[in-house]
Amino acid sequence: MTPMSPSTSPAPSASSGVSSAVSSDGTVLAYRVLGDPAARPLVLVHGWAQSSASWGPELLDALATRFRVVAVDLRGHGHSGVAETGYDSSEQWADDLEAVLDAAGIAGAGDAGAGGAILLGWSYGGIVVSDYLASRGEGRIAGLVLCGAVTAVSRSAGGAVGPAMMAVADGGFAEDPGTAIATLAGFGTAMMRSGDGVSRQRIFGLSLATPPAVRQKLLTRRVDHDDTLRGLTIPALVIHGEHDGVVLPSAGRANAEMIPGARHVGFAESAHAPFLEETPRFLAELDAFAAEL
């Protein structure tokens, strides 16, 4: 199947509760906004072969009592357009996030009445938020949260992936449904050490719903953001599950060490999705982080 071009990508319907922005190359990007418009923005950037649905309705509702939540669907994922290009470009990923921030009306940290957004990247979302910070800087961002995140697709310590992620290359890009299902089932199982079956099946389903070409393009780019992280001046929180077999816990520690003043928190009962596996603690850590900004 040929990937859809930006010009033919459907805009999400208003009835879906999803809004849309248009990136610099014409790709339609979907996002959801929840919570008090006057609250501090929390921008959620999901991981590889996932979407804004990854966070789950219960967590999104809980976050919406604390923040103005902006949950993004990355290009090629969820309700966003499936562009043919742009997946290997740090500048394009930065343009995508900038388009969503513009459309959602997120002001800069120094603007009157604005405190700046918290940017939260989960898994591959750590690369995307780093792309944004490298290109656009910290002007709109008050704080950074990395959750089970990689910040590189390279030999950088911040890009250390585990066996569950490496196994994806053996069939996770296949168009044959049987091959893809068999491979991604293992990936989905590794996502969570605990948690309900509904959440686990949702995560698995989102991986299958992401076009095979998109799954491949994200993982065949080459990028690292070691210098980006070392140059940050905003507060940062790094959360990582101690049983993560998708992105190794060592990546979380390395990322925290590279960011000046970052706080690292290991979640002892979690694998790759601490926000679903240890939700009360995840919320408490976010509350404490936001209170210090």
Predicted regions and their residues:
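Catalytic active-site module of serine/aspartate enzymes centered on a nucleophile-bearing elbow/loop
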Residues: 262-293
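Conserved alpha/beta-hydrolase catalytic His-Asp/Glu region
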Residues: 155-156, 175-230
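Short beta-strand/loop motif that positions the catalytic acidic residue
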Residues: 232, 238-240
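Active-site loop/oxyanion-hole signature of alpha/beta-hydrolase fold enzymes
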Residues: 57, 71-120, 124, 284
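Flexible "cap/lid" loop of the alpha/beta hydrolase fold
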Residues: 130-175
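Acidic catalytic loop of the alpha/beta-hydrolase fold
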Residues: 243-247
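Conserved HGGG/HGGXW glycine-rich cap/lid loop of the alpha/beta-hydrolase fold
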Residues: 27-83
